A protein has these predicted regions:
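RNase H-like, Mg2+-dependent phosphodiesterase core
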Residues: 1-4, 8-147
Length: 147
């Protein structure tokens, strides 16, 4: 099928950035570093890069940032899908390691059920402590466990 050929014949790289690194460096810096790492890990060096929304400092390859790029450029949309599928697979693996959070149901998004689980069990090492809802839920847990 043509869509399978597009994927099979395309070079791509998926980079994982830990929650701890995102908390330490901030989401924007982590995203920029992830973009640089993903591009550097490509088997074939691209001659030009389309980027969703923002310029990536430090690239030696010409680039074009496109606001709303995942809606207007197929390659950016494909990158968004690859990132989401990779993230969902990672969360599915985490669900086995941390069953108390019910990750298989909400995929790690900040649902009421997820925040309730953080209030009951505290945040795991995979939670982003700089997210206000996670920090608040974790503080509730900390207060509830103090003697």
């Amino acid at each position: 099928a043509p869509s399978e050929m597009c994927i099979r014949d395309s070079a791509y790289s998926v980079v994982h950035i830990s929650a701890g690194e995102i908390d330490r460096r901030g989401i924007q810096n982590a995203n920029l570093d992830g973009a640089r790492r993903a591009i550097s890990e490509l088997v074939v060096e691209p001659g030009f890069v389309l980027v969703d929304a923002f310029r990536v400092p430090g690239l030696t390859i010409p680039q074009l940032p496109i606001v709303g790029g995942d809606y207007t450029a197929r390659c950016i949309a494909a990158a968004s899908i690859l990132a989401k599928v990779s993230r969902d697979r990672l969360v599915t693996q985490m669900a086995e390691e941390f069953p108390e959070y019910g990750l298989e149901g909400h995929k790690g998004y900040g649902t009421q059920a997820h925040m309730d689980a953080v209030r009951r069990h505290g945040a795991s090492p995979e939670h982003r402590y700089t997210y206000a809802n996670v920090a608040a839920a974790h503080q509730t847990y900390v207060r509830s466990t103090k003697p």
